[in-house]
Regions:
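Conserved N-terminal segment of class I S-adenosyl-L-methionine
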Residues: 1-79, 97-101, 106, 117, ...
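A conserved beta-strand element that flanks and buttresses the S-adenosyl-L-methionine
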Residues: 83
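Hydrophobic adenine-recognition pocket in adenosine-nucleotide-binding enzymes
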Residues: 87-90
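Short glycine-centered segments of the SAM/dcSAM-binding site in methyltransferase folds
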Residues: 109-112
Length: 134
């Protein structure tokens, strides 16, 4: 299981209520572009895309996937480069192994991954810290 329905609803609400939530990937767009240029690759999947900032910022077509965001919840096809920014620390502990396997299954060649190692400034609507596994 990638996400429980209860947690999916909490995340939907968090994304809806916080305009700044889900835009962290923009910080890394230049680094991702540099990596893609270095390996001559434009087949990219943004796994956990939130507001799909990479699709807006990068000069080539990006697959945007996020099970918490209805318009991005369709399962993607595997890509040569998978980008996963500010996602894993938000995964429910009991779902982490399945999410990691899912990420592996969608990654053909390379991955660009970030994981926060401190508590988030934001709280979930139920009061828990938004970073569940730090």
């Amino acid at each position: 299981m990638l996400i429980t329905e209860e947690y999916r609803e909490l995340n939907k609400q968090l994304h809806k209520d916080n305009k700044s939530f889900g835009i962290t990937s923009a910080i890394y767009s230049d680094s991702i572009l540099d990596m893609c240029n270095a390996i001559n690759e434009e087949d990219v999947l943004d796994y956990g895309c939130a507001k799909a900032e990479l699709a807006r910022l990068l000069p080539f077509k990006i697959q945007s996937y996020d099970p918490c965001i209805e318009k991005y919840s369709n399962r993607p096809r595997p890509a040569n480069v998978l980008v996963c920014i500010d996602v894993l620390e938000h995964i429910e502990p009991e779902c982490l192994d399945d999410v990691l396997e899912d990420i592996r299954s969608f990654t053909k060649k390379s991955i660009f991954l970030t994981v926060a190692t401190a508590e988030a400034l934001k709280k979930l609507p139920d009061g828990r810290n938004a970073h569940l596994i730090v």
